[in-house]
Amino acid sequence: MMYRTTILTLLLLAAAGCRSDRCNTPFGLVEPVNINDPEFAELSNVGGSLILNRGYKGVVVTRTSYDDFEAFDCARPNDNEVALQPDAEWGNSILVCPSCGSRYNALDGSPLDGAVSGCQLYHYNTTFDGYTLSIY
């Protein structure tokens, strides 16, 4: 009887580990960004958005006001080896998984209708001193 209980417990744990709503996105190093650098010109205006080759699978950054920025990792939340891509129609404001088609709002990190996972994108904190954007 103990053998059956142990096997059943192990099977249940293994099944729970395969669920698609497991949120486990690691975060990566993000170096500060000088928004006056021409490379980051998209971030100089409110509403500007840019995907930086930083973080774990890239970081989408959007300037939401003069002093505020939102930053999310482009790794798919339930499978961090997959990098989300900008939507062909919506650009950097919507990120799409090339494998399953799941879509995420890059302004708040939320999954959109039809996403395989209910997990949100990994959110980075930001600070801005007027010249340098720090993402952590």
Put a short name on every predicted segment.
Residues 8-12:
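Gram-negative bacterial Sec-dependent N-terminal signal peptides
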Residues 14-17:
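C-terminal motif of bacterial Sec signal peptides marking the signal peptidase cleavage site
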Residues 90-99, 111-123:
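Short cysteine/histidine-rich metal-coordination sites, predominantly Zn2+-binding motifs
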Residues 104-112:
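Short metal-binding segments enriched for Cys and/or His
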Residues 1-7:
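Bacterial N-terminal signal peptides that target proteins for export
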Residues 67, 99-100:
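Short loop/turn microsegments at loop-to-beta-strand junctions
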Residues 19-91, 105-106, 122-136:
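N-terminal pre-ligand scaffold of iron-sulfur
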